[in-house]
Amino acid sequence: MSKKIAVIGECMIELSEKGADVKRGFGGDTLNTSVYIARQVDPAALTVHYVTALGTDSFSQQMLDAWHGENVDTSLTQRMENRLPGLYYIETDSTGERTFYYWRNEAAAKFWLESEQSAAICEELANFDYLYLSGISLAILSPTSREKLLSLLRECRANGGKVIFDNNYRPRLWASKEETQQVYQQMLECTDIAFLTLDDEDALWGQQPVEDVIARTHNAGVKEVVVKRGADSCLVSIAGEGLVDVPAVKLPKEKVIDTTAAGDSFSAGYLAVRLTGGSAENAAKRGHLTASTVIQYRGAIIPREAMPA
């Protein structure tokens, strides 16, 4: 019987400059991960579900249609009257440096745990094999909704499920660094696999040797710690089994076009192997291969035919 992973988060409308024109697309860290997992697994082994809230507008419908086309199940995605998806604009200067502007305060995804359907959705999610979320999934919620989400994660683990967390830290989404540290600590205490981008760890906790970052995460109760270091090797530490250092795929500088979804796609490649019985080392190799392919194309979601074999 196929196992199930629910990816929890937010997808937004993306507006980006293309010469004198503005191009519209969709983007979101967890959505990127869900698509790249779905592209790399046999649905008979693992089905991918995306959990969020959208509006009843045409943009929301276009998102749903796109996700269906990627074999991402949306049966647990809510549609809310009088709500819309969030929006962000990417401005690119003459050197290629990007600046992001966000409009998301009233986005539907912020309220997915406050609806009449949320209790029934949580009841279903508590029986999933895997729940995946990121720091952004937590940041957009009210404190009350965060508590509900943490309760759901604990219940899922009590039922035999596993929780996967990507530390994706965006300071502008949080009231303070202290609040983030407190929430992340609670999150790690109910996490089985943690993906840590080292730059985000340094920004949130202060710069520390990577060994200390790994030890702190294990001490919170996380069994499997995956440290992402951009173009450098990744480190996988499994409690009781030791550390594996897996080299990245090296690309010539001119082949790197857009690093937008590098971390999201790495996590997807890793999980596509790991959650279907592969070793941590092979999972990390697949993560590197996926990320190194994705960054050779513009945009977060690359053409399906460009995916590695």
Curated annotation (Swiss-Prot):
Which top-level enzyme class is recorded in the Swiss-Prot or TrEMBL entry? transferase
Please tell me one Gene Ontology term that the record gives under cellular component: cytosol
- Active site (UniProt): D264 (proton acceptor)
Its domain of life reads Bacteria
Q: What is its EC number?
A: 2.7.1.45
Give residues annotated as binding ATP: N168, Y169, R170, K228, R229, G230, A231, D232, S233, A261, A262, G263, D264
Query: What keywords does the record list, in alphabetical order?
Result: ATP-binding, Carbohydrate metabolism, Kinase, Nucleotide-binding, Transferase
pH note: Optimum pH is between 5.6 and 6.
**What's the protein called, per UniProt?**
2-dehydro-3-deoxygluconokinase
User: Which species is this UniProt entry from?
Assistant: Escherichia coli (strain ATCC 9637 / CCM 2024 / DSM 1116 / LMG 11080 / NBRC 13500 / NCIMB 8666 / NRRL B-766 / W)
Name of the encoding gene: kdgK
